[in-house]
A protein has these predicted regions:
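Hydrophobic alpha-helical segments, especially transmembrane helices
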Residues: 3, 7-8, 40, 133-136, ...
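Intrinsic-disorder/low-complexity regions
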Residues: 3-6, 24-26, 98, 148, ...
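Acidic/His- and Gly-rich active-site-bordering loop/insert found
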Residues: 22-127, 137-153
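Histidine/acidic-residue-rich, glycine-tolerant segments that coordinate divalent metal ions
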Residues: 115-127, 133-134, 145, 152-258
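Alpha-helical transmembrane segments and their juxtamembrane interfaces
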Residues: 16-17, 142, 240
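Bacterial Sec-dependent N-terminal signal peptides
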Residues: 1-23
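Generic marker of residues within folded, mature protein domains
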Residues: 2, 11-13, 71, 84, ...
Length: 258
């Protein structure tokens, strides 16, 4: 946890023109233990997209305890914290996603999720299987560190985003709705950073690239209509199963060759 806290804090320092010497001596060790505790709590209490009510309350309460200006109810359950430095400067935003997945946890951990909810009309377990519990806890830690070190130029926006995994059918949500509701305005954001933990990256390391990264997936539906016929005259029918199989194979070829 500590390397992530340092990396995010240093990123803000660089963009906001804060000297690294001002923040490198902060007590990351003290905050690290809190971040682990927060992560365990969030992991044990996961919530699905657009339903992150308790997670939002947990985050908002922490930010308020630090004296940070807090906005709630952004894009349904999103939370935004605003921390102003002692001098004027750029506005830097940090973003973490909050929602969990409809997955039943099979780990044997003291903080494992036992939560059960409804997803697409079916009962399912709920689990932070994509690391969002860690993202939230890290950003809460960065907020605490910076709130104790306000001698920087500019403003920091802490954006806790709901519904990164996709809104429920028929609902708006996620980053798109947050932007629509003005999360990048008042004050206008000059730069924004997001992170995602990765088991393939060594502890203490970060990876980055120019241009797009952490792209979202999209969903679409293909309806295939067949034509019924008697079993003795299959040539008079249109078999939707065979057609579906061909389409699936063709789409998979696109993915593997691009």
């Amino acid at each position: 946890m500590k390397p992530y806290l340092k990396n995010l804090t240093v990123a803000i320092a660089l963009v906001a023109s804060t000297g690294f010497s001002q923040i490198k001596d902060l007590d990351f060790n003290a905050v690290e233990s809190k971040v682990i505790e927060w992560r365990h709590h969030i992991h044990q209490n996961p919530e699905l997209s657009n339903r992150e009510f308790k997670t939002a309350e947990y985050v908002a309460a922490h930010l308020k305890s630090l004296g940070i200006e807090v906005q709630t109810g952004v894009a349904h359950t999103g939370v935004v914290g605003i921390l102003k430095g002692k001098r004027k400067g750029k506005v830097v935003a940090l973003r973490a996603d909050m929602d969990a997945l409809p997955v039943t946890e099979r780990n044997d951990l003291p903080y494992k999720s036992e939560v059960v909810s409804k997803f697409n009309g079916q009962e399912t377990g709920v689990m932070h299987a994509c690391g969002h519990d860690t993202h939230v806890a890290i950003l809460m830690g960065v907020a605490e560190i910076l709130s104790q070190n306000k001698d920087f130029a500019g403003t920091v926006k802490f954006i806790f985003q709901p519904a990164e995994e996709g809104s429920p059918p028929g609902e708006e949500g996620g980053a798109k709705l947050m932007v629509k509701e003005g999360v990048l305005e008042n004050p206008k954001v000059d730069a924004i950073f997001g992170l995602h933990i990765n088991s393939g990256t060594h502890v203490g390391k970060i990876t980055y690239k120019p241009g797009g990264m952490m792209a979202a997936s999209q969903r679409f539906v293909i309806n295939i209509k067949g034509k019924q016929a008697h079993g003795s005259t299959p040539w008079q029918s249109v078999d939707p199963i065979v057609a579906s199989a061909q389409i699936i194979n063709g789409l998979q070829t696109l993915i593997s060759r691009e």
